[in-house]
Amino acid sequence: MFGGGHMKKLLLYYHTIKYLKFSQICYRICRRLQRRLYNPYIREAGTVPSVNMDTTYTIPELDLDPDYLGRFNPEELQQNIFTFLHLKKKMDIRNGWNDMSMPHLWRFNLHYFEYLYSIANACRLSKDEKYYEKYKEIIREWIKNNPIGKGDGWHPYTISMRLPNWICTYELLYDKIDKDLQFKEDILRSLYTQYRYLQRNVEKDIRGNHYLENLKALILGSIFFKKERLLQKYMNELDKQIKEQILEDGMHFELSPMYHNIALEALIKINFWTRQERYTDTIARMLCVTCSMAQSSRLPFFNDCGEGVGKSARVMMDTAQKYFYINAQYRTSFEAGGYYILPSGPYRCIIDAGKIGPEYLPGHGHCDALSYELSVNGELIIVNSGTYTYERGKWRDYFRSTRAHNTLTIDDTEQSECWESFRVARRIKDSEGCMENHDGIPVFRGSCLNYKEQRHARSIMWIRPDILLVVDRVFASEYRYTKSYIHIHPQYELIWTDHWEITKEKKRTADIVCINADSAKKYRGDEINGWYAPEFGLKCENDVLEIISHVPVSGYIINFSNQPIDTALWERIMDIVEKEKIKSIK
């Protein structure tokens, strides 16, 4: 009845759906029915309530941060030229809002309206009316050409992003808008319509960061439109979501540093808008994660993560300190989230030993268990590959794959079955990590089972202040080989002499010495491997070392010292490896 391809697809669906909460399935069915049977009959708001202009909505340190504003060129926007995800397009703002030739995430960014801050700020600083006229034109054309409930602009997530941006820039340009009565009526009517529409279309089927953004927008809308009863309702629901989504150590439960920062920004803003200290303790815990993980404001690339999304770690810390008197505390272990940091003088290794994500929401997860990133004096040397796109296809598949991270495959088996853009079928389990002490040396130990229930255990330690040892153990009744990957930052390259060297501008930075390896091969810009995506929509070639081994215990040394490894140190290293081998046999 079913061919092999159909059966495989059915199994993927089965192993994906079985992890969902029953409520998610019910809400998904209800949302589909609502879109067809109810949403088409939603009409524009009639009477618009008075709005609250006694509250400050814009946080200058966040919303007008120069680095953030620099993402949007107000002069290009004057010509209807929009740039997102490193894709620039001159757009027809009458008919181009749902241009299917552009990536889905690009269209979503278009509907977020974050670029309004750049236009509004240019208007305030220059006093040039052309910016106000462009501000009005873009909003009016959106209202005119995006019928209620149709297209990307009425997706609950785009409403959740756009509504705060319209309200905050409304405040920034209030002196002008208050005198422009027709436009004032137009924007307020649309805002109220979007607010009411979102109330009926929250993303309880997806949950996670989407639902958090829904609640943020509804809380702001309730403050703006003076809906006190609804404000309390959404605040109470947010309390429940914080208990679910923010782990004990402060990490957001989707385990993406980027989405963690987005959730942190949402709570900072809600705390600011409500003039309460309701979430100050939660913000402090979350800020501890951001402060500890960030390197020169760059977050580590675990799970879906990239630069140029949200605000920088520095801006978050400065804002929280100014308004809530929070000083972030640095930590090296985040047990609930599964992240661990091994510092050694100028060197810093950050490791992921966590799950792929919540069982019912792994959509932003990558196959990066037991992977790490390594830096020296804040400069990255060994990196994960990042996130290039959310569009399904070979690039989405590659950047989520095990081989795109500094970890190990067993017989080329992925840690988890990632498929489509945001789906995961069978996945890793029993992932765990801890920090131990080995003869006075801090050691990270972690392990996980891939979806075929083959166990990979890894130990990472600084055996000297400038020599890192990585030891891998495989627990599997039958397997042929392992492949371990080391991804080098594009500023560096791998060179083979009589061993592998990491170099920068032809000068040696470190040696890589393989342990129990049968072969090693370098990739760069290959179809299989050798790509790095620092931001969405931007990828470049980088060197990747693939180390193949046929024995249960293998590994490598990264030697930053100026001295080769002497006999005494090598014997000590092999003694450690032998002890790990005994553990694997046991």
Which residues does each predicted region cover?
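Residues that act as N-cap/strand-start positions at coil-to-secondary-structure junctions
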Residues: 76, 238-239, 326, 334-336, ...
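Acidic/polar, glycine-enriched structural segments that form the non-catalytic walls/loops
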Residues: 30, 34-37, 41-60, 126, ...
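Long, acidic, intrinsically disordered low-complexity segments
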Residues: 46-75, 90-124, 207-223
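CBM-like, beta-strand-rich accessory domains located in the C-terminal region of large
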Residues: 3, 7, 16, 160, ...
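Residues that flank catalytic or metal-binding motifs in active/ligand-binding sites
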Residues: 111, 214, 338, 368-370, ...
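Extreme N-terminal leader/anchor segments
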Residues: 7-89
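Aromatic-lined, polymer-binding surfaces characteristic
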Residues: 104-283
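Carbohydrate-active enzyme catalytic cores, enriched for enzymes
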Residues: 247, 251-383, 387, 433-443, ...
